[in-house]
């Protein structure tokens, strides 16, 4: 089973392009259908308890990569983790108020989409703000033998990329695309499909 973990917005629609290429046995988390937690590890436990099957692959986008790290450490040590442009919380982020981070992240296109989704009651702003807070407070411990990391190389500044301090071996794939577009990028989708199908990269 492949488990998909969205970014801090928390809605599985971010995986729409990828989902059309994956096998049927896929579960996508939707944070807006779950109880809000005070710690990222608690959210990981909640998601793990609700799964029908153990995942063989966990694909986490942005915030979802950090959540996937916790799931692999705590619940599914044999699962393969793919972090899609996920980063560690920097000191500057930890010091920035949650509301300010949220406003900094918004673009016009995203804001329009968020407004529509809130009107449809598909997403809830308190859940998004809580996810930002969970990430800011996250204190990861070295745990994993290996993981796959897709890194966006366009417009990526002031981010903490010290995953090598926590993961013994990182398979890195660079994509020349900005963070908001990475889950629609054809090279990234192709890479993820090959990974989950067990294709060997030369």
Where do the protein language model's features map onto the residues?
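A hydrolase-biased, glycine/serine/histidine/acidic-enriched motif that marks catalytic-domain neighborhoods
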Residues: 1-202
């Amino acid at each position: 089973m492949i488990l998909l973990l969205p970014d801090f917005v928390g809605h599985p629609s971010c995986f729409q392009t990828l989902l059309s290429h994956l096998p049927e046995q896929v579960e996508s988390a939707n944070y807006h259908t779950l109880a809000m937690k005070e710690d990222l590890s608690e959210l990981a436990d909640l998601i793990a308890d609700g799964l029908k099957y153990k995942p063989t692959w966990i694909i986490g986008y942005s915030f979802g990569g950090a959540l996937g790290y916790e799931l692999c450490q705590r619940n599914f040590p044999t699962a393969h983790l793919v972090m899609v442009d996920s980063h560690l919380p920097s000191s500057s982020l930890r010091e920035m108020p949650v509301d300010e981070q949220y406003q900094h992240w918004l673009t016009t296109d995203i804001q329009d989409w968020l407004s529509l989704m809130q009107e449809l009651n598909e997403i809830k702003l308190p859940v998004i703000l809580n996810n930002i807070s969970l990430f800011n407070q996250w204190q990861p411990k070295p745990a994993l033998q290996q993981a796959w990391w897709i890194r966006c190389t366009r417009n990526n500044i002031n981010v903490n990329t010290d995953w090598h301090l926590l993961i013994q071996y990182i398979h890195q794939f660079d994509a020349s695309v900005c963070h908001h577009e990475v889950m629609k990028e054809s090279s990234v989708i192709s890479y993820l499909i090959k990974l989950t199908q067990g294709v060997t990269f030369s």
